[in-house]
Amino acid sequence: VRLFGFSFNLRKHTPESPLNLQFVIDAFASKDSIKKEKNIDLRFNSIMIRRGNFSYNVDSEKETPGKFNAKHIDIKNLSAKISLKAFNKDSVNAHIKKMSFDEASGFSLNKLSLNVVGNRDSAFVQDFEVRLPQTNLKIGRARIDLSEIDSLPALLNNAPIDLNITPSQICLKDLSPFVPAFKNFADTIELSAEANGYINNFNLKRLTLKYSDKMLFIGQMELKNITYPEETYLLGKVNKMYIT
């Protein structure tokens, strides 16, 4: 599949209004009143996208220049190279070799790449990399066990996670379109970590943070009850630390 130089524009008059392509959706909708099990089974050896543009606007909602707005999305210069080896109701196996785009809020994704394999029991991500103008985040591996999950609370508390963040550089200014307070944080933080546990109870068994030559932290950290702010607490152990 190759998509070069395309523009895809979605629009609503109000949040409750139908999309401007609703007539297309209706045309392909099944007329059968008896619901049938969807049997999706797709494979794309190669999906190439270049110079793509995508927009989504809800006309009744205010625009917020310089700040990301989910009601006014404007993506330019979308490029991607993807291999979808399997996609069906039970599993997914995909390789995003490279994806990049610019968003009108000022957010720029220079590169996204990853391998993902998932089924009903687990999901495994390998060689995840995100590059922003001054950020390079690398996750060597990430795995979540979904075998005991039957609800959202179970996902938060009963889905074991294993995560490895290889040495990375984070610049909070790159995220300022989402969090305007980060606009003045132009310095880079070096980060690496090894973590496991659950979404709601996270154990950073190895954490290294370095800020230029002004700050260094090496240690461990536990975050408990993350989704319950009134009950959240942090327990840490410092192996080495200095601030100048």
Language-model features and meaning:
Residues 41, 117, 194-196, 220:
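Transmembrane beta-barrel domains of outer membrane proteins
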Residues 1-90, 107-109, 135-148, 152-160, ...:
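Secondary-structure transition motifs
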Residues 102-108, 131-138, 210-218:
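Solvent-exposed loop/turn segments connecting transmembrane beta-strands
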Residues 163-165, 193, 219, 234-236:
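Membrane-embedded beta-strand positions of outer-membrane beta-barrel proteins
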Residues 171, 242-244:
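Outer-membrane beta-barrel translocator/channel fold
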Residues 7, 53, 113, 141, ...:
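Membrane-embedded beta-strand positions in outer-membrane beta-barrel channels/transporters
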Residues 95-99, 122-130, 201-209:
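Transmembrane beta-strand segments that form the barrel wall of outer-membrane beta-barrel proteins
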Residues 1-7, 97-100, 112-114, 127-128:
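N-terminal beta-strand/beta-hairpin edge segment
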